[in-house]
Amino acid sequence: MPMTRDFFATAPKGLEPLLVRELDGLGAESIKETRAGVEFRGTLETAYRVCLWSRLANRILMSLDRFAAATPEALYDGVQRTDWGRHFGPGATLAVDFSSRRSAITHTLFGAQKVKDAIADQFLEHCGRRPSVRLERPDIRINVHLDADQAVIGLDLSGDSLHRRGYRTEAGPAPLKENLAAAVLIRAGWPDIAARGGSLIDPMCGSATLLIEGALLAADIAPGSFREYFGFLAWKGHDLELWRKLLTEARERAEAGLARLPPILGYDLDRRAIHLALDNIDRAGLRGRIHVERKVAADVRPKGRPGLVVVNPPYGERLGDVESLIPVYREFGETLQRHFRGWNAALLTGNFELAFQIGIRAGRYHTLYNGALECRLFLFDIAPERFFTPRSGVPETEGQKKLRQIVEKARRGAIPAEQSEMFANRLRKNLRNLGTWARRNGVSCYRLYDADLPEFAVAVDIYQGEKLWVHVQEYEAPASVDPAKAQSRLAGAVAMIPEVLEVPREQIFLKVRRRQKGDAQYVKQGQTAHFHVVEEGGWRFWVNFEDYLDTGLFLDHRITRGLIQQVARDRHFLNLFAYTGTATVYAAGGGAASTTTVDMSHTYLDWAGRNLALNGFGERDHLRIQADCLDWLEQAVDRRRRYGLIFLDPPTFSNSKRMTGSFDIQRDQGPLLKKVVSLLEPGGMLIFSTNRRRFRLDETALAGCAVEDVSRVTLPKDFERNPRIHACWRILAPDRQR
């Protein structure tokens, strides 16, 4: 019986879940997704198949030994434990890759040299000669990774990164790596579309990487079949007969696959790109199978059966100014809407705002990395109900228009200086105190001002992402206050924000906060769909300053989310009235066994999914359910579902038309809490929060549970001026197993 070995497949960040599925299909066993790759077990044939057929992996490492290496001497001794003469001879060329994390040996060149010395000294002792070093295409490549002073030493079977298929010797500007291109196509559902006979079109094909990878997928061609070099060809354990058998099998599959290849077409305006594309297509053996020609993207038209339009357009970071690209995206979007209805589309871009110029609402989003550059893959169904009118240039929202008018008034002297200066002084004071606190504690999103001065009833929130954004909420004045005076005070306050915070007006967003009624919490304020990414607690979230009443991230629950992360490990987590799922991200990050996110709004549930995806959490263990939470609770109780951790943050009041009746948290808390507690496992925890002021907890509904008021504990420093912003309890179910 063939010997089973341990292997590790490295992969670009974000591709690990796809690689797990691919390895499973290639016969790997004991598959485990880890940081920067996937562990698996298999025979030598399994490893050869992965080297030949993996479309996603970078390198395949065969584990040789593991040992403690807290010092250079321990590393040297550990490397010498392996009998290197069993793997290669002294006449072979050698390269060593060394990496280190959380270890005493931090210098990678020093670590690599120590490994080389240990191997060379062993050969000198046994053979009287040593292998020579060759950095490019060595006969043998050794990989050593040190993590927490534990070394893993392996043989790099790939030799060179597997994304280098061999068909591309030149590329145009901003090239796309071949395994990333394959991931884009797999995420876009191209294998299924191709199986149905659908066409593949790339309107900005560049050097044809997406087109060629699409053909390899559709025709069942092994991506490693073009390569002449692998890291096992000079290895003493290499089974040449087995390798030749696998190559023959791959050739037979390719011949059969090419006979059913659907139409694949590419276009580009750049003559040089078309020449490169044709050369690459020739080297891939696909001449006559892929059609490319010079044409502007806006003039591309469908050919063949409806299929997939895939594109990796320029996005500013690589080929120029973002503003100049808006017409490119917009014209391309208009082409899709007019001529490609019924098709699917996939767009990979490093600029989220440019993607909205397409004018089609994406059904799904995935975060991928083009090298170190974070990108988003947007997947579209091209149908009229998904179309919207994108904004022109850098459009001005109603809030920004109001802000501009206020600032212009201040410049003309139409706003009394004393009004402005009073607010500005308080803002500067808060910036000194809270700004310093935020920097020291790694808090990038916080409330800077919260109606500190009664005359200026606004909240000013700071959001740090790729830029610094300021979100200003004007609290609606009571009926007893003269509207003219209220507006004058608002103007005096807001006019100073750009100057004091040194933030461009375009990065400041102004809203009026009113009481929510019925479906109000789900209704958009505008139609811009304008999102940004911010960070909190090491996690990343999409926020929207313009289209909804709230931004998608409740800042007052920062500590509450951290508490959830602390206690989530190995628990099944339920998030009720989940909003954008930020608590779910924290639970997943804390090691929850699974998460279930329930909300009535499709918009917010989709937002939650994008937040999970942004942080690398796939759909396998993270269920999202669109439902009236009260109705869903009834069903969950009947089905006797159980969770180890539940977060309950219901609305204060709701009479939405999508609900069977009105809901008042003070009035209806008893039945609600009883049902939620009944879903807890023995010893399980419920974190219950409400924003209702003067809320009184009915502890009779929690009989038998341990109840702890954590309102003060979960109140962040930046909300201490408003201690009743929320009330929060930690509720423990009785441990019936005692």
From Swiss-Prot:
A GO molecular-function descriptor: RNA binding
Record keywords: Cytoplasm, Methyltransferase, RNA-binding, rRNA processing, S-adenosyl-L-methionine, Transferase
Subcellular localization, as worded in the UniProt entry: Cytoplasm
Known EC number: 2.1.1.173, 2.1.1.264
Catalytic activity line of the entry: guanosine(2445) in 23S rRNA + S-adenosyl-L-methionine = N(2)-methylguanosine(2445) in 23S rRNA + S-adenosyl-L-homocysteine + H(+); guanosine(2069) in 23S rRNA + S-adenosyl-L-methionine = N(2)-methylguanosine(2069) in 23S rRNA + S-adenosyl-L-homocysteine + H(+)
Domain THUMP, first and last residues per copy: 46-157
A Gene Ontology term for the protein's cellular component: cytoplasm
Domain of life: Bacteria
Entry keyword annotation includes Transferase: yes
Top EC category: transferase
Database matches in InterPro entries: 23SrRNA_methyltr_KL, DNA_methylase_N6_adenine_CS, RlmKL-like_Mtase, RlmL_1st, SAM-dep_methyl-trfase, SAM-dependent_MTases_sf, THUMP_dom
PANTHER family (alphabetical): RIBOSOMAL RNA LARGE SUBUNIT METHYLTRANSFERASE K/L, RIBOSOMAL RNA LARGE SUBUNIT METHYLTRANSFERASE K_L
Function: Specifically methylates the guanine in position 2445 (m2G2445) and the guanine in position 2069 (m7G2069) of 23S rRNA.
Family under the similarity heading: Belongs to the methyltransferase superfamily. RlmKL family.
Protein name in UniProt: Ribosomal RNA large subunit methyltransferase K/L
Species of origin: Methylococcus capsulatus (strain ATCC 33009 / NCIMB 11132 / Bath)
Source taxonomy: Bacteria, Pseudomonadati, Pseudomonadota, Gammaproteobacteria, Methylococcales
